[in-house]
Design a protein with these regions (language model features):
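Alpha/beta-hydrolase active-site loop
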Residues: 227-248, 266
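A domain-start/cap signature at the N-terminus of enzymes
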Residues: 7-183, 262, 270
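Short alpha-helix in the alpha/beta-hydrolase fold that links the catalytic acid
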Residues: 203-205, 311-320
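Primarily recognizes the serine-hydrolase "nucleophile elbow" in alpha/beta-hydrolase
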Residues: 251-295
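Catalytic histidine-centered segment of alpha/beta-hydrolase-like enzymes
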Residues: 333-343
């Protein structure tokens, strides 16, 4: 009969083998996906740790060295990311509402670029992202993160908290990006994410357009599906309106991407009572033209002509049903136009916001 110590060593070996499966998958993706320095170090530390565990039944000294080395690498990356992120003084913050406390430490552990690109690469391999959508996306996303790091340093992301299921009305992550102006305008933008959850980089891309009117951009988080029309989603939006109200924001523009845009359309009949609501914008996601029309609010619709998820015909019909008071911008782009056609999307948002602010003033 095997001794308990021997059984434990073989159990650790089995754990190492099981850990090596996702690690090898990530290493394979790393050869075709741009990876950050912290991502590379995490992979290296994980390889050392898994290798040490696998060798446990036979090479105890080697096991100890590998496991210790792996843990040192992983914990060092965690410590450095926590220090850099939680002490960052940029305009991009990830806070928890409604308590308005600082970011969850969990949100600082992994670079968002790695989670986004590894996730997209996996979805592409299993058919969740089409070849046309996949083409050029990694390069566009990598370039966006490079620009964001220059402007903001190391920043947090709500991705991990979202997939663990932490986004609830009593505690949800919000990406808040203050304008660059020393004296911001009393204007705020609420931007709702779509399917796969909230990411700081998308909020930052929208905020760069919003900065033209010196307004604050806030991007709340709900579940990763982006089901804003559920009671929890509506409650999160209401809390976000309240947050901006407490900041003395007088005019609020509400917009969304994909499921976020659909959420705006499905909820607008009950959100129309928010006194600060001044306009709506939809990016690759439209719904409920009649209810939107009844608000009498100005509307911006941005749509990709080659969108495989939201047919361009649906956007055109939505615009036709709205009639007057709508600005329609159609781009030669697929569903991921915010990342692939960033400048065109930002210019459309900036021009529309400037026009609305000029009219209101």
């Amino acid at each position: 009969m095997l001794k308990s110590s021997t059984l434990l060593r073989y159990l650790l070996c089995l754990i190492g083998i099981l850990l090596s499966i996702p690690i090898l998958a990530l290493v394979t993706l790393a050869f075709i996906t741009p990876v950050t320095v912290s991502g590379i170090l995490y992979l290296f530390g994980s390889i050392l740790l898994a290798s040490g565990l696998i060798l446990t039944p036979w090479q105890l000294k080697t096991r100890n060295a590998l496991v210790l080395g792996g843990l040192i690498v992983i914990l060092s990356v965690i410590g450095l990311r926590l220090y850099l992120t939680l002490n960052e003084t940029s305009n991009l913050k990830v806070i928890v509402l409604p308590s308005t406390r600082g970011t969850r430490s969990l949100n600082a552990l992994i670079d968002e670029q790695d989670t986004l690109l590894f996730g997209e690469g996996l979805l592409h391999l299993i058919g969740g992202v089409s070849p046309h959508e996949h083409e050029g996306l990694a390069l566009a996303v990598t370039a966006a993160y490079q620009e964001a790091r220059v402007a903001n340093g190391v920043f947090s992301s709500p991705v991990l908290s979202t997939y663990i299921g932490f986004q609830k009305p009593d505690a949800f992550d919000v990406v808040v990006i203050e304008p660059s102006a020393e004296r911001p305008s009393p204007v705020g933008i609420i931007f709702l994410h779509g399917f796969t959850g909230n990411v700081s980089i998308q909020c930052w891309q929208i905020a760069r357009a919003v900065d033209r009117i010196d307004a604050v951009t806030v991007c709340p988080s709900t579940n990763w599906i982006g089901e804003w029309w559920l009671p929890e989603g509506e409650a999160i939006i209401r809390e976000t309106f309240g947050y901006l109200r407490e900041k003395s924001i007088q005019r609020i523009y509400l917009g969304g991407f994909s499921n976020g845009g659909g959420g705006v359309g499905r909820l607008i009949s009950i959100l129309a009572d928010e006194p600060e609501l001044s306009g709506l914008f939809f990016i690759a996601g439209v719904r409920n033209a009649q209810a939107v029309h009844e608000t009498g609010l100005p509307v911006l619709v941005i749509q990709g002509a080659n969108d495989e998820r939201i047919p361009v015909e649906a956007a055109r019909q939505f615009v036709a049903d709205l009639g007057e008071g709508v600005t329609y911008v159609e781009l030669e782009a697929d569903h991921f136009l915010i990342m692939k056609q960033t400048q065109a999307v930002q210019e459309a948002i900036s021009a529309w916001l400037l026009e609305q602010e000029k009219t209101l003033k």
